[in-house]
């Protein structure tokens, strides 16, 4: 079970986009994530008439290392550490370490 999942609201803790928050769009391998509207880069693309794609400068999200994001806790309005816990019915769930609130229901 991962500490962060696709769709989680995260806050960036290091790098050029420090302090920004957004949803996780994709997880690449074990170490990198793509966060919505964070770490934007400009990609210069050549037109491809066979694929009917125009050329130009496209702005899109680049990946950042998973250690540079923290799950956003709406109760404290900050990034928070995550722990794992087993419930009485045997399910393994994530919880915020600051206020013991369960994330996965």
Swiss-Prot record:
Pfam families: KOW, ribosomal_L24. Keywords: Ribonucleoprotein, Ribosomal protein, RNA-binding, rRNA-binding. One of its GO terms (molecular function) is structural constituent of ribosome. One of its GO terms (cellular component) is ribonucleoprotein complex. CDD domains: KOW_RPL26. The keyword RNA-binding applies. SUPFAM superfamilies: Translation proteins SH3-like domain. InterPro entries: KOW, Rib_uL2_dom2, Ribosomal_uL24, Ribosomal_uL24_KOW, Translation_prot_SH3-like_sf. GO terms for biological process: translation. Part of the 50S ribosomal subunit. NCBIfam families: rplX_bact (TIGR01079). Belongs to the universal ribosomal protein uL24 family. One of two assembly initiator proteins, it binds directly to the 5'-end of the 23S rRNA, where it nucleates assembly of the 50S subunit. One of the proteins that surrounds the polypeptide exit tunnel on the outside of the subunit. This is Large ribosomal subunit protein uL24. It comes from Nitrosococcus oceani (strain ATCC 19707 / BCRC 17464 / JCM 30415 / NCIMB 11848 / C-107).
